[in-house]
Structure formats: structure tokens, C-alpha cells
Amino acid sequence: MNKKPILIDTDPGMLVRLSTDLDDDLAILFLLASPEIAILGLTCTYGNSSIARTFADAKTLLEHAGRQDIPVFKGAGWRTRDVNRETDASRFLAETVLKRPGEVTVLTLGPLTNLATALTHHPDLAEAIPELVMMGGRLRPGAEFNFGAHPKAADLVLRSAIPKVMVTIELCFQAPLTAAELRRLEDRPDSHLARYLPVIRRWLRLQRFIFSLIRLRYPEIPAGGFFPWDGIAAAYLIDPSLFSEIKVLQVWMEKIGP
């Protein structure tokens, strides 16, 4: 089987304190277990936690998975989100893609600073990326976290020539992970998620509470469990045929902030 080579730009936080989500980690585990995918590296960004914590989380997650062969690079932080400032992550991203032009798919699961920085310093990079899959954005007015964390970076990426697939927040609302799914995982002790079930259960309870409050303002958000946002974008890499009604749109950012 020819594996699809990918780079993952990510802000994982399941294994560290002071994190706001665990969906990046679940998406990475999903892709690690997928024979169709070859992960060439992880570039870490801020978002669900600080850059120091997301970097530590990524290293620990790959150690748990026995995949220390996959390199991990530290990128921008909340206080260093400047596309004019190169980082280890932005350099690795650009160098890896440019060594294999037209081959390496990029998956972004957090704010887009690292990719925007790579594009700023390597103008030929956009032509070398065959596909960019992003978890981010929304179709109705209002900010989505990944794009809203650094609007200028998001706008730079959106206006680039890279072929893009945007997995929006509304799309992810169609796939809640419920207590019933967790019970099925508990019945499979061989599952690679087994060791993480306690933290997943805690997050399910917390996110159900959070969304019960948000639903007062946005009643269209379905009830159920929690939403594994980034796992939906990862699923697109495995099998795009799972997705219907794909729309071709021109997308950009308005009211761009810092």
C-alpha cells in the first residue's frame, strides 16, 4: 500500500495540565493507527495550551505510541505569533515539503501561525503543497478558535495558492462522541485508546456542561457528547468519500486583528 505522507501542525493538550481540549491527541492517535498514512513530523503551535505544554504533550504522546521516530518541532507561542519570525516548526515544515514538492499533504489542527510563517519566508512553498486540510473556520458569522487566534495568519494561508479543504466547526457538530461510544471502547481493552479513557470521560462530562450553556445562545448545536473536532479533519485524509456536499468557495478573513 502506498501511504500518504503528511505533516501535522497541531496544538495537543490531552496529557498536560491547563489544556482546553483533547481532540488533537485523538486525531494524532487515529492517524498513527491508520495504515494509509505516513506521518513525517509534528509541528507544534499554541492554542489548546501554551507552546511549551503542547510541545511536551506531542513528545509524550509519540513516546506512549512507540513512535519516537517521528520528529517534533516547536513553533510559535501566544506571545510570539509573528509570521516574520521563523521557528523550528516553520523551517521544518518548509524544508520537508520543498524536498518532496507535490507529495506532502499538510494537516492543520490549530492556529495557522506556523504555516503562515513558512509561506512568508518560502514563497515557493504554496506551489509545492498538493493539499492542505484545515480544521477551522465557520460558515456563519462569528469567530472560530483556530482562525480567530491569529486572523492575519489565517488570512495569509486562505489567500495562498495551496489547494485547501476546510473542515468547519458546523461540520464537526454532526459527529459527537457520546458515552455510548466510550462504553464500546471500554469493552475493547486492546484499543490503543484504553489508557486514555479516564481523561476522555472527564472531558466528555466537562464539554457536555459547557455546550449546555452555549446551546442557550446557539440552539442548533446538537446535544450528545463532546465533539472530536480534529478527528473529523483526520477522517477526511483517510476517506474523503465519507463527506458529501463538498462546496467550492472563495474564503478570506474580515476584520483582521493582530
Model-derived segments and their meaning:
Residues 1-258:
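N-terminal acidic, glycine/proline-rich low-complexity segments
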